[in-house]
Amino acid sequence: MNTDIISGKWTQLKGQMQAKWGDLTDDDFKVAEGNAEYLQGKLQERYGWDRDRAQTEVRAFEKSLRDDR
């Protein structure tokens, strides 16, 4: 998975991610600190998604960022 966008711009993107995934806490984002795999795990935990769904959600978020450029 290409995690360059999320990893490289974590601070700037955190607000957008919090708006999209409101069940994640500030602490979740602090611990994740740019780690997309950890973020996927938290999405699974908070939303009850399987691994594929969480991965799809993160990829779709990354794609939306690329498309917005």
From Swiss-Prot:
Query: Between which residues do disulfide bridges form?
Result: none
Q: Which family does it belong to?
A: Belongs to the UPF0337 (CsbD) family.
Origin superkingdom: Bacteria
Give the originating organism. Answer: Xanthomonas campestris pv. campestris (strain ATCC 33913 / DSM 3586 / NCPPB 528 / LMG 568 / P 25)
Q: What is this protein called?
A: UPF0337 protein XCC3924
Q: Which Pfam families match?
A: CsbD
